[in-house]
Amino acid sequence: MLIFTAPGQGAQSPGFLSPWLELPDLAEQVGAWSELAGRDLIALGTTGSAAEITDTSVAQPLLVAAALAVAGLLGEPDAAAGHSVGELAAGAIAGVLSPSDAIRLTRIRGEAMAEATAAEPTGMAAVLGGDQAAVLAAIAAAGLAAANINGAGQIVAGGTLTKLEAFAASPPAGARVRPLRVAGAFHTPHMAPAVEALAAAATGTVVKDPAITLLSNADGAVVTSGRYWGERIVAQVAAPVRWDLCMETMSDIGVTALIELAPGGTLTGLAKRALPGVELLALKTPDQLDAARELIAAHAASTNGYAAVPVGVPAEWRIVVAPGGGTFRSGGKEGEAGAVAAGATVRAGAVLGHVVQRGGERPVTASHDAVLTEWLVEDGDPVGEGQPLVRLEPEEQA
């Protein structure tokens, strides 16, 4: 199973787009998106200075345009995920919204977030190392917010520059603090005004349910509703990015290869530690396109509806996820016996349980003949859309 990931702000560097624009039709496509972005993305991605492309209103559409342009050169992945603004690129790759709408919303997002940063000098800093619980407690005690939790040993704090400086001067035990090249405290309450602006802009945007598995920064869940994804993408501006949970879900759903779209490097660096055994490729130049296509050919599988189950490729186990939020009820129809026991054989289409919602119940079904190896929730547990519920192992491997 292969996933495309799209990096977030901070991944850009001067001139990173130059080699890509030498490819046929790519400059024309980026030029068209420049009109939607209200900025000359070609000039900014080739000759823009570090200071120019650090500007939030510039960096965000530039990164989304780059990710979408490069994704268009490759085949369709099985799954997609984006870090921060990269979520908009991932949404377009998954077919939730058009690339043009992704660029349009990114422009509004970037401009609104830039405006929010002007209210008070804020920033972000990476906290490297230390005990995670102790680091999170220290961030809160310093009056800062944990804006990104990127995995073991890397948490990003956001807040006022004054508080960040004080925090860096007295870091948590075993940790070091490194300022980031960003213009404000993104994914913190400082961005609340930007949430309102993006919500207004998103109203009326045509969205569809994802055509492939799509992960959410909010909690790593697989999102199966385009409408719900839209709500999450708006709220996420002022909420933490849980990339650690996204990588946990990648492991749970059986990802075997990860391609980070240009400008690659940041997310593959995190995956090296969190996803051992997964083949990784960070796309930096067009010279790597053949390697990317080979990786896709070797690892791509289809996905099967809301269950986010890779099929067509042998796997040690597969995950069935919740089709929506609600309360999990094991068993078949109401009044029937409870959970299918671990070790039992289930047939394709068998009802394993239901998610009870206000408007009724949504069945959770087996997508293929398999052995149920482990329940990940219990009867009566509250569940969120995309939450892993049960592990299934193909019969031939049981």
Where are these regions (language model features)?
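FabD-like malonyl-/acyl-CoA
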Residues: 1-134, 180, 257-286
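Acidic, low-complexity mobile loops and tails
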Residues: 305-354, 361-363, 369, 398
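Non-catalytic positions within long, well-ordered alpha-helices that form the structural scaffold/packing
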Residues: 248-254
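Short, flexible loop segments at boundaries between secondary-structure elements
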Residues: 279-303
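Alpha/beta catalytic cores of group-transfer enzymes, especially the acyltransferase/condensing modules
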Residues: 9-11, 36-39, 93-238
